[in-house]
Amino acid sequence: MDLIIASRMDEASMLMAEKIIDLYDFNRLNENEYQKDGFKLMFIDDLHIYHNMEKLDFDTLIFLSRHSSSAGVKSLTVHSIGNYRKAELGGYDNKTVLSAPYEMSSSLRSIKELYNDDGYNITFEATHHGPYTKNRSYFIEIGTSGEDWHNDKILEIMARSVIEKNVKRFRSGIGIGGGHYAPKISDYFFNNDINIGHIIPKYVSETIKDNQIIESIENTENCSFILIDWKGSPSRLRSLALDAADKCSLELIKI
């Protein structure tokens, strides 16, 4: 069973949760919990990025969330959880958590299939922020304003991409390089039968340590490759990726 988590401090999170409950007729267990088939939905009072948790008896945790963009870019995104530097938005410094490459990638693939317009950027984001969990987990987000969060068509797409996603067990790997939205990694993903877990962006290239890349590999289930945006990776990050691929006997895919 998977656990869907909605924060009462996040309007988009609440709206997505309400759409899931209504669309799939979830059964109310109590004021904070609903359930249907292989999913439980839980409301929390604090902001999800700060809601650290010990190991829970669920397969995957799915956090519903708003997405913020200083540029106002309309986006539908998914991303793994953790920090490659100081934890300014939840979690722990320099620590990633277990990603969910099969489920997260399948949610993004579902969004892409269901949304056939040009109004939103559909993409991975690099691994960032909290909370710290001991379960496989990922965020699914709507950005970037109230207009987007209240868009009924978008809410239905996101709900369906959580509940109805067709989980494909393609081989999984991590991404390295590029900006926060990892455009080349996302494009390659949509055109190849792969799944992605953690993504390490170029903006951490000067401070990331080799053990953090190894941890990202270990926290990506059945990781078999590193997908690297070669031109979008400074020389230090390229070198660390090459070393990690060699140490962990992974295929290095340059794009």
UniProtKB/Swiss-Prot annotation:
Domain of life: Archaea
EC code: 3.1.1.96
InterPro entries in the cross-refs: Deacylase_DtdA_archaea, DtdA
Reactions catalysed according to its record: a D-aminoacyl-tRNA + H2O = a tRNA + a D-alpha-amino acid + H(+); glycyl-tRNA(Ala) + H2O = tRNA(Ala) + glycine + H(+)
Parts of the chain that traverse the membrane: none
A single GO molecular function term of this UniProt record: D-aminoacyl-tRNA deacylase activity
UniProt enzyme class: hydrolase
Keywords of the record: Hydrolase, Metal-binding, Zinc
Cofactor binding, note field: Binds 2 Zn(2+) ions per subunit.
GO biological process, one term: D-amino acid catabolic process
Co-factor requirement: Zn(2+)
Subunit composition and interactions: Monomer.
Family indicated by similarity: Belongs to the DtdA deacylase family.
Function (record text): D-aminoacyl-tRNA deacylase with broad substrate specificity. By recycling D-aminoacyl-tRNA to D-amino acids and free tRNA molecules, this enzyme counteracts the toxicity associated with the formation of D-aminoacyl-tRNA entities in vivo.
Classification via NCBIfam families: PRK03995.1-4 (NF003072)
Name of the protein this chain belongs to: D-aminoacyl-tRNA deacylase
Organism field: Picrophilus torridus (strain ATCC 700027 / DSM 9790 / JCM 10055 / NBRC 100828 / KAW 2/3)
Organism phylogeny: Archaea, Methanobacteriati, Thermoplasmatota, Thermoplasmata, Thermoplasmatales
